[in-house]
A protein has these predicted regions:
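Short alpha-helix boundary/capping motifs
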Residues: 123-125, 195-196
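Membrane helical hairpin/interfacial module
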Residues: 84-124
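A gly/proline- and charged-residue-enriched helix-loop-helix capping module
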Residues: 127-165
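Flexible glycine-/small-residue-enriched beta->alpha junction loops
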Residues: 125-130, 134-135, 182-190
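Active-site loop segments of alpha/beta catalytic cores
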Residues: 1-82, 102-106, 149-436
Length: 436
């Protein structure tokens, strides 16, 4: 019998690298690993949680698991995501172990699933995650308020419930539903360009649409999830509604506002959160530009939201931890200080493009830069862990992405860089906390 522990860091990464290179030996070996995984041979291993006295890592790996299963079994995207929850969960958990990521984190094609529930026409490529058909929007300005609450007991919601049941069964971690936030859901079913046009020309309509989606889709789905899984969590995702795409002021007054109004702002005691607003540097840059314009006679308008206010409003919809994503482009020290000020742990992201082998022009330079960045991230995470009121379990039971977080890994990720980054995690001394 294959022992999954024999592929602990960095051996699993070396296997992934050989598989990626296309060697027949590696393909046969990785097939034997996944044969065993899907048969349930590793289920006991999956119940081992990340150590509570260490800085750990998490990763979104569903695209990498799809690439492997498509290569070794010919499993298509639709089959992978929608037909066998045990295969799906075991494959994703196995990929996490091969990578050397100690905190398990279950993800799927959440933007696609969220709009497919409503009847949006989808595209399912064989080897890649699904997406909405951009040429056939589900709703428009004339009919958007006719959208009603879907049935959460069947179809995509049931598929997700089954994945979460299996994940909880195998890992013991609390179930985490991942769905689109109102703005990103609107972008997928209304169309990015029409929605952006209305952001500029008809903001009242946009806010009414976001509230309608929240009331008819998001809130009922949250309530369904928490009824099925009373210990559950909900991660809303809103990349399209981020400061980088629609600006800090619109992010505040539209995207985040539509979440803040849910559950009177309590967000089910913080168990509903959105941690993926990206592009914080936009607020920082625009704030500096505003100060420089004060000495000029320009009457042009500028954002009213600076980096500190943006952080405040992001915290209002992600109350349990502080997130710094790669696209934020703000020094990690700022997020370290914000975490300490708010007495919450810090998560720092490694962007998918940073470790994409097709995007890296100079691998040695990338190794140097990412190695140094990862060292800074791990140092900041450890400092926060040692200074805040951290529970004894270090939140390893909670299902959110924590500590060093690979935002998306796939079949084109440069596994040598992943190994280099994770070395900083593995080399980090244990967390030292004062004892009473």
């Amino acid at each position: 019998m294959i022992d999954l522990a024999s592929y602990s860091y960095p051996k699993g990464l070396h296997l992934l690298k050989s598989w990626q290179a296309g060697t027949e030996e590696a393909k046969a070996e990785i097939k034997s690993v996944f044969d065993a995984a899907i048969a349930g041979d590793f289920d006991e291993n999956f119940s081992v949680l990340a150590p509570a006295d260490e800085v750990h890592s998490t990763a979104s790996v569903h695209m990498l698991a799809l690439a492997i299963l498509n290569d070794i079994y010919g499993v298509t995207s639709a089959e992978y995501y929608k037909t066998d929850p045990y295969r799906y969960v075991r494959a994703n958990l196995t990929v996490g172990r091969l990578l050397g990521v100690k905190k398990l984190y279950m993800t799927w094609a959440l933007y696609a699933f969220s709009c497919e529930v409503l009847g949006q026409k989808m595209m399912y490529p064989d080897k890649f995650p699904p997406g909405s058909d951009p040429d056939e929007a589900l709703i428009n300005k004339e009919n958007c308020f006719e959208l009603e609450t879907p049935d959460f007991s069947t179809g995509i919601p049931k598929i997700i419930d089954d994945i979460l049941r299996v994940t909880e069964e195998l890992t013991g971690m609390e179930p985490l539903l991942q769905i689109s936030a109102p703005y990103s859901l609107a972008a997928d079913i209304y169309g990015q360009e029409p929605l952006l046009a209305d952001v500029v020309n008809d903001p009242d309509h946009v806010n009414a649409l976001l509230d309608h989606l929240a009331d008819k889709v998001i809130i009922p789905w949250v309530e369904h999830h928490l009824k099925v899984f009373p210990n559950g969590w909900v991660e809303l995702s809103d990349a399209s509604g981020s400061p980088f795409f629609i600006g800090p002021e619109n992010c505040k007054s539209m995207s985040i506002r539509s979440i803040q109004r849910m559950d009177d702002g309590n967000l089910w005691n913080g168990r509903v959160f959105d941690c993926n607003y990206r592009g914080d540097y936009v607020a920082n840059v625009q704030s500096k530009n505003r100060r420089s314009r004060r000495s000029s006679k320009s009457t042009g308008t500028s954002t009213k939201v600076d980096l500190n206010e943006l952080t405040d409003i992001k915290f209002s919809v992600c109350q349990k931890f502080m997130m710094r994503l790669e696209a934020d482009k703000v020094d990690v020290a700022f997020y370290r200080d914000q975490s300490l000020q708010r007495n919450i742990p810090l998560t720092t992201g490694i962007g998918s493009g940073e470790v994409d082998r097709n995007s890296i022009e100079n691998l040695e330079l990338a190794r140097e830069q990412l190695g140094n960045a990862a060292k800074d991230y791990v140092k900041a995470i450890k400092e926060v862990c040692e200074q805040i009121d951290l529970p004894l379990n270090n939140f390893v039971n909670e299902p959110w992405p924590s500590h060093l977080y690979f935002e998306d890994l796939n079949g084109e990720s440069e596994f040598g860089l992943v190994e280099l980054i994770l070395k900083q995690v593995y080399d980090c001394p244990k967390i030292s906390r004062p004892t009473n």
